[in-house]
């Protein structure tokens, strides 16, 4: 966990290197039993510039991958937007590459993610991470359904 794990208020900032990408501070509440976080609530996120278009097709799927220390996953670029976060005490170094045509093509952004941070990744931006902690539960909310027949549309860089 980062030093400011329990001190954040819900906030968002745009990532200058990759247009449309957003980084969120997520409040985490802890006591002697452990901790709790509200990972995502649409009504609270929309006023913070979370794109309403994320919900336009009425499809939502939440996935969680579990990985061990030093595992490197990615880079994946699927045909959907995603909101990613860490769901446990783990930490990752997240990395993104803009694969969309235009001035930001090839731009890269990296940051460390723990449970107190969320990232909105627009479609066309490749997403990957390396596990820094012993284990991690990496959660991603996407706005389309994964299907084997669509796998040719997915890019693995």
Per-range role (PLM):
Residues 2-113, 133-135, 142-157:
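Non-catalytic, conserved peripheral segments adjacent to functional cores
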Residues 112-134:
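Conserved metal-binding segment of the jelly-roll/cupin
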């Amino acid at each position: 966990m980062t030093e400011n794990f329990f001190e954040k208020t819900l906030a968002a900032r745009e990532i200058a290197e990759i247009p449309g990408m957003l980084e969120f501070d997520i409040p985490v509440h802890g006591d002697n039993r452990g901790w709790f976080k509200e990972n995502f609530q649409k009504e609270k996120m929309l006023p913070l510039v979370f794109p309403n278009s994320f919900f336009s097709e009425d499809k939502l799927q939440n996935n969680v991958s579990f990985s061990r220390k030093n595992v490197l996953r990615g880079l994946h670029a699927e045909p959907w937007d995603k909101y990613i976060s860490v769901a446990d005490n783990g930490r990752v170094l997240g990395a993104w590459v803009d694969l969309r045509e235009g001035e930001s093509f090839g731009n890269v952004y990296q940051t460390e993610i723990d449970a107190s941070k969320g990232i909105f990744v627009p479609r066309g931006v490749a997403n990957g991470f390396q596990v820094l902690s012993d284990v991690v539960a990496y959660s991603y909310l996407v706005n389309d359904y994964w299907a084997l027949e669509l796998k040719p549309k997915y890019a693995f860089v």
